[in-house]
Amino acid sequence: MVLSKRPVRISKACENCRKRKVKCSGGDVCFECQKYNENCVYRQFYRKIKRLKYNNDNSKIDNFSNEQMNIPEFISVRNLNDDSSSIEFFGPASNISFVNQLNHYLRKAERNGYDFLSEGQNDITPEEERKGLEKFGMKLMVLKDNANNFDFSLSNITTEKMNGLLIAYLETWHIPCPIFKAEDLFNLSVRTWKNPSASVHDKALLYLILSIGSAASYFDLQSNSSTLPLARGFFNLALRTVPHIFTELSLDAIRIVFFMSVSAGNLGDTALSYLYSGTAVRMSLAIGLHKCKNFSNDLSDKYQNIRLWVSVWQWEGYWSFCVGRPSCSRQDIPIPAVPNEAFSFSGYGEHGRFLINHEHMRLRVFFSSCCSKIQSEIYSTNRNLLSVLQTVEQISKEVDKEYFSSTNHQLIRSEIGEYCKTLDINSCREWFWIRIYYLYLKLMIFRPFLIFLAYVNISKTSAPDDIIEGLKRGSDQCVQEAIDISKFIVQLNRKVRMLQPIFFICTYLESACTVLLFYIASNSAKIQGQLATEIWAVLRDTCSFLQGSSGPYVGSVSTIAKDALESLNNILVSKKYQDNSVNNTYFDKVMQHVLVHSPAFDDSSDPKFETNRSETPTQYTLDDSANDELMIPDLQGFWEQTLDWINN
């Protein structure tokens, strides 16, 4: 046995200072937390030594490393310590589904000696530890990156193939991020492709655009199964071409870093994508791009710079909201204007392909501005729960009003019928991109209330009727948006064959399906028959639709197959173990951690809480005699704890 020590970075800043990115003064309660009257929480200091068994067979070491890299990690910074019970169940827009996180929890519980099927059996072999959900008849599949095994070389890619990838980009990401006109990209490819004398900036930019185009495919059996490795190859080539791009301050550097962010998001590298998007914004602010300075006397270049800033700003605002991280755009930076002359392009060629639509971009900018507003309102620790509910409902109405008052009526249509087959393909693509943005934004607005209501029901926490009604409205709205977004993506792609960044679009479907999963698991006893039938129909239809997606993507969405859903539902709601003579479900077991860490359940500070102590994680029960005046602050603390779980 050889011990391999790997140091782990220790942050001595408290959570609030870390989020604000300010120096923490330390102490029992740091200066910043005193200033804002907030709870000062430090990470547990620790060092971890990883032990690895190996013999002289180097291939086994490589296989073990690859397998470890394929295990999904949580976004939450509080999950660095395996001994921590602060499990994040549901990250904001993480590609990690509820199924993946439950699997991680089960493996961890087994590692700690809590085998749900065999009480008292603490000797868990490494093979059993990795099984997780396989014990219950579910085989968890993860997305594998085959880029390392892919023979990537520019010499193997013809000019015809390159042009096809360029067109794939124009048919997909050019719509939400229209920085270049189509003719500009074709000119870039002509002067750069396999040209040794071309500038490194042009080469890197072209490689990134080709990477984005490479990840596009169709939701059918004829789609190309090697798209993801090719996209990864171009992305890595771009990084090698401009290794010091982050030290530059120029328009070229901003374009390259921005497309790095989009490409990384396209490949599922959420953390990298978020990092690059913030870097692109900071670069833009540093050179004054947000002030629309005249970097060139050419009018075409001026409009392109405007499109660059608007695209960078709206993408960073949207993406930071999705991954549940703060936006790096300062509050004093105004919302970018969307001038009609900069965002109106009739298209390329006689058929007007790859046009730029002003109204589409105007809506995207408005939605991105709502993202920061939602983030600040929902996750504000200075607002009580009832006012948060009212404010969020008002923001939702503002989003609806702006969207449905659009001058382009095609962008706001919801019905899908035979007319879609004769619809102009440019209009169809724009409609698809803006409507999934709208539906996803609505889903994200209400998802915290869906989860919080489940926590409240599990803990049997008392709450005023108006708060419970508000939570129910938000929960029901979230479920409806999840149903709508799944139906829209599936039905439109069946009517109109469109190139899609499949892995990216699958994250929309996965987010919607995990919401439905969560709702089924937490409401199985009282869900109405008609709604249950509709949810199961949507889930089955989504699974059937995804079976036609290209090879590398199937693994990432197989966990929502019908048999897996039924198995998961049985696991969560079946009586499987006894805890202090009280029957609990797996769902109870998973969810009870939030009660342990909630400030509302501190028995040392309030005698009204009855504690039932045992070796297993402690469960707390509220005294029924507590009056509403005492319960409201407790519920508020419970709400803030839930937000911390969801968003950190």
Curated annotation (Swiss-Prot):
Organism of this sequence: Schizosaccharomyces pombe (strain 972 / ATCC 24843) (Fission yeast)
Cellular component GO terms, alphabetical: nucleus
Gene3D superfamilies xref list: Zn(2)-C6 fungal-type DNA-binding domain (4.10.240.10)
Location (main, coarse): nucleus
Record GO biological process: DNA-templated transcription; regulation of transcription by RNA polymerase II
Subcellular location: Nucleus
DNA-binding span(s): 13-42
Free-text function comment from the UniProt entry: May be involved in the facilitation of anaphase progression in mitosis.
Assembly and interaction partners: Monomer.
One matching Pfam family: Zn_clus
Superkingdom of origin organism: Eukaryota
Gene name of this polypeptide: grt1
Name of this protein: Zinc finger protein grt1
GO-annotated molecular function: DNA-binding transcription factor activity, RNA polymerase II-specific; RNA polymerase II cis-regulatory region sequence-specific DNA binding; zinc ion binding
Keywords, ordered alphabetically: DNA-binding, Metal-binding, Nucleus, Transcription, Transcription regulation, Zinc
PROSITE patterns the record matches: ZN2_CY6_FUNGAL_1, ZN2_CY6_FUNGAL_2
